[in-house]
Amino acid sequence: MKAVIQRVLSGSVTSEGEVVGSIQKGLAVLVGIARDDTADDTEYILRKILGVRVWSNEDGSKMWCRNVKEIDGEVLLISQFTLMHVMKGNKPDFHNAMPPEDALKVFNALRDKLRCEYAPHKIATGNFQHYMNIHLSNDGPVTLILDSKKRS
């Protein structure tokens, strides 16, 4: 499982002309689910989303010390199978991505665990397997790329 985590001032997802998810200050998280992902991969990404310290303390004197829960932030969780690409020449190939029916179950499990371990009203999502327009107001910018198969 891969995740691109961005610190944002706000974010929204529009699908079929309707805003389907939006947040204020927090994290926008793009998630790619691989064919061989397990519950352990989901748990790793979950822990990182909730635990990653990308905000300073309140007076700004110490950087990288607070996570999304500590700032009472929100999470915009968006499925993005294209993160699982491999390049075949100049063309991306997505055979490493989990099939949509199975990926939806994994994505929903991640969403539900985030809501359970943080707060249901703090977790917004896009529409799974739909074309979406994503609008973000990046803060920093701060962007982190995680891969559950390459843990540090």
UniProtKB/Swiss-Prot annotation:
One of its GO terms (molecular function) is Gly-tRNA(Ala) deacylase activity. The keyword Coiled coil does not apply. One of its GO terms (cellular component) is cytoplasm. A motif (Gly-cisPro motif, important for rejection of L-amino acids) lies at residues 140-141. Its EC number is 3.1.1.96. One of its GO terms (biological process) is tRNA metabolic process. It catalyses: glycyl-tRNA(Ala) + H2O = tRNA(Ala) + glycine + H(+); a D-aminoacyl-tRNA + H2O = a tRNA + a D-alpha-amino acid + H(+). It comes from the Eukaryota. Disulfide bonds: none annotated. Keywords: Cytoplasm, Hydrolase, RNA-binding, tRNA-binding. Pfam families: Tyr_Deacylase. The keyword tRNA-binding applies. A Gly-cisPro motif from one monomer fits into the active site of the other monomer to allow specific chiral rejection of L-amino acids. Homodimer. Belongs to the DTD family. An aminoacyl-tRNA editing enzyme that deacylates mischarged D-aminoacyl-tRNAs. Hydrolyzes correctly charged, achiral, glycyl-tRNA(Gly). Deacylates mischarged D.melanogaster and E.coli glycyl-tRNA(Ala), protecting cells against glycine mischarging by AlaRS. Acts via tRNA-based rather than protein-based catalysis; rejects L-amino acids rather than detecting D-amino acids in the active site. This is D-aminoacyl-tRNA deacylase 1. The lineage of its organism: Eukaryota, Discoba, Euglenozoa, Kinetoplastea, Metakinetoplastina. The gene is dtd1.
